[in-house]
Swiss-Prot record:
Its EC number is 4.1.1.23. The active site is at residue 73. Belongs to the OMP decarboxylase family. Type 1 subfamily. Substrate binds at residues 22, 44, 71-80, 131, 192, 201, 221-222. This is Orotidine 5'-phosphate decarboxylase. Pathway: Pyrimidine metabolism; UMP biosynthesis via de novo pathway; UMP from orotate: step 2/2. Catalyzes the decarboxylation of orotidine 5'-monophosphate (OMP) to uridine 5'-monophosphate (UMP). Keywords: Decarboxylase, Lyase, Pyrimidine biosynthesis. The lineage of its organism: Bacteria, Pseudomonadati, Pseudomonadota, Gammaproteobacteria, Enterobacterales. Homodimer. Signal peptide: none annotated.
Length: 245
């Protein structure tokens, strides 16, 4: 399926599903994308694919009607991070992220860089604690807080800086919705339908559980991209979410 769209006229989806594209080969990625419908999900492009294929690959996905989460986790001095976020907005992506551990000045600069884009600005999300990290990993970094407590501290800083939300584990979602309110968006990786392997994610949850926990956007990768019928898999996930709503 190929749809023609621009940043202002993409296919609209109400689905909270964001499919993580993790391909080494551009043609394989596009072959997968052409099997699914932009009404059923958004797409996430991360560091590897963006480094391999660049902004033009994002444009090709947008031309097929998909909203794009550009998952590059910017973490730099404030001026550099701000310019990077503005470049993502120029590309017309739907969502872009930074590391909350970059600090308040960096996050504020990133937010201010999006002001000129007005209603066309992408959602600006901060990464708290990577879902692969456990308490022992934080101890190695000199942190005595649990992953949940550290993530909440970073989320509070993110909200104070005026960003749209955070990337967090599904286990933190219930608490975060209570503390930060319904408008503060929660984006959660490590979401896997029942029966899927955990892979390299440590803190995982099913789509239905994530929805109940208050997750706004759930990132799902291999259970969809490696499915023999990804379009049907997406429809089944969305149907289960509608039943759970």
């Amino acid at each position: 399926m190929t749809l023609t769209a621009s940043s202002s006229s993409r296919a609209v989806t109400n689905s909270p599903v964001v499919v993580a594209l993790d391909y080494h080969n551009r043609d394989d990625a596009l072959a997968f994308v052409d099997k699914i419908d932009p009404r059923d999900c958004r797409l996430k492009v991360g560091k590897e694919m963006f480094t391999l294929f660049g902004p033009q690959f994002v444009r090709e996905l947008q031309q097929r009607g998909f909203d794009i989460f550009l998952d590059l986790k910017f973490h730099d001095i404030p001026n550099t991070a701000a310019h990077a976020v503005a470049a993502a907005a120029d590309l017309g992506v739907w969502m872009v992220n930074v590391h909350a551990s970059g600090g308040a000045r960096m996050m504020t600069a990133a937010r201010e860089a999006l002001v000129p884009f007005g209603k066309d600005a992408p959602l600006l999300i901060a990464v708290t604690v990577l879902t692969s990290m456990e308490a022992s990993d934080l101890v190695d970094l000199g942190m005595t807080l649990s992953p949940a407590d550290y993530a909440e501290r970073l989320a509070a800083l993110t909200q104070k800086c005026g960003l749209d939300g955070v990337v967090c584990s599904a286990q933190e979602a219930v608490r975060f919705k209570q503390v930060f309110g319904q408008e503060f968006k929660l984006v959660t990786p490590g979401i896997r339908p029942q029966g899927s392997e955990a892979g390299d994610q440590r803190r995982i949850m099913t789509p239905e559980q994530a929805l109940s926990a208050g997750v706004d956007y759930m990132v799902i990768g291999r259970p969809v991209t490696q499915s023999v019928d990804p379009a049907q898999t997406l429809k089944a996930i969305n149907a289960s979410l509608q039943r759970s709503a």
